[in-house]
Every structure is written in C-alpha cells, then in structure tokens.
Swiss-Prot record:
Gene field: sta3
PROSITE patterns: ENTEROTOXIN_H_STABLE (PS00273)
Superkingdom of origin organism: Bacteria
Function per UniProt: Toxin which activates the particulate form of guanylate cyclase and increases cyclic GMP levels within the host intestinal epithelial cells.
Signal peptide per UniProt: 1-19
Name the record gives this protein: Heat-stable enterotoxin A3/A4
InterPro entries: Heat-stable_enterotox_CS (IPR019806), Heat-stable_enterotox_STa (IPR001489)
Family of this protein: Belongs to the heat-stable enterotoxin family.
Subcellular location: Secreted
C-alpha cells in the first residue's frame, strides 16, 4: 500500500512545474529561419520508368520539397 501511494505521489509530482525546467522559450540558442520557395513544375515528360522518377522535376511535382534539387 505504501509503495503504491509513493508511486502515485511521484507520478503526480513529475507533472508539477517544480519538476520541469522553467527556462523561457526565447532563451534557446538555435534560431530557425524558414524560406519559402516556388516550385517550377516542368511539363510532364513522355518518359516512364526509373529515369524520370529520379529527375528533380519529379520530386518537385510531388511535394515541392526544398531538399530536392531543381525545386525553386
């Protein structure tokens, strides 16, 4: 019985503000900047197969992922 009460007490205590780090969010050292890019979607080529699947335009047409080359 004592062990269960202690377990419940520690569980509740872990969610209290005393158990959590109280640093403000602005104090983080990492700064993230977002860049918006336009997708130049080229006309679909008549190619089919792995050659067209690996092209940068295919990646751009799917999701405009900024990590893809040719997706600007």
């Amino acid at each position: 019985m004592k062990k269960s009460i202690l377990f419940i007490f520690l569980s509740v205590l872990s969610f209290s503000p005393f158990a959590q780090d109280a640093k403000p969010v602005e104090s983080s050292k990492e700064k993230i900047t977002l860049e918006s890019k336009k997708c130049n979607i080229a006309k679909k080529s008549n190619k089919s197969g792995p050659e067209s699947m690996n092209s940068s335009n295919y990646c751009c047409e799917l999701c405009c992922n900024p990590a893809c080359t040719g997706c600007y």
